[in-house]
Regions:
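N-terminal amphipathic/basic-hydrophobic helices that include classical n-h-c signal peptides
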Residues: 1-10
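Long, low-complexity or tandemly repetitive, helically biased scaffold regions used
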Residues: 9-156
Length: 156
């Protein structure tokens, strides 16, 4: 299933002072990437875990495929761990956006809003790293094509 290329999503740091709309756009894209990982990674892990114990025998071929699937299973588990670590940062970002939405823009609140936007930027920066890592590990796990496991080494 195609996923957006995270390399195309610019990451801002605290020195760029992005605007409210830029941060919301970046957050929305990041949230979508996290949702895709949450939808795709556990089923991939399950498919790998279903095939792995079916590899039978002590042949070089069986050992090679077993090792490949163990690596893919580990990559899928690390992917899940990474996107789950990003969840608290995304939830906090949600709360900040809610605060910004509930509070009308007034001149006397400019410093407060700017501090919230800076905090939102920092949260996004941290979560981007975790989601990037999760996607990289997901790609590694997905690269292990289960269809390439020869039927001759699988138990029914």
């Amino acid at each position: 299933m195609p996923r957006p290329n995270h390399a195309l999503i610019s990451t801002m740091d605290s020195t760029t002072q992005p605007g409210d709309a830029d941060l919301r756009d970046e957050y929305a894209a990041l949230r979508e990437r996290a949702i895709l990982l949450e939808e795709q990674t556990p089923p991939l892990l399950q498919r790998i875990s279903d095939v792995l114990p079916r590899i039978s025998g002590e042949s070089e071929l069986a050992d090679e495929h077993r090792e490949r699937l163990v690596g893919a299973r580990n990559a899928a588990m690390v992917s899940i761990e990474n996107y789950q670590q990003a969840i608290p940062f995304l939830q906090t970002a949600d709360s900040i956006i809610e605060q910004l939405d509930k509070t009308p823009e007034r001149d006397e609140d400019i410093e407060w809003r700017e501090s919230l936007l800076q905090r939102l930027d920092e949260l996004i920066d941290v979560a981007v790293v975790m989601i990037n890592d999760a996607e990289d590990y997901f790609d590694q796990a997905q690269a292990c094509d289960l269809a390439n496991v020869p039927k001759s080494i699988l138990e029914d």
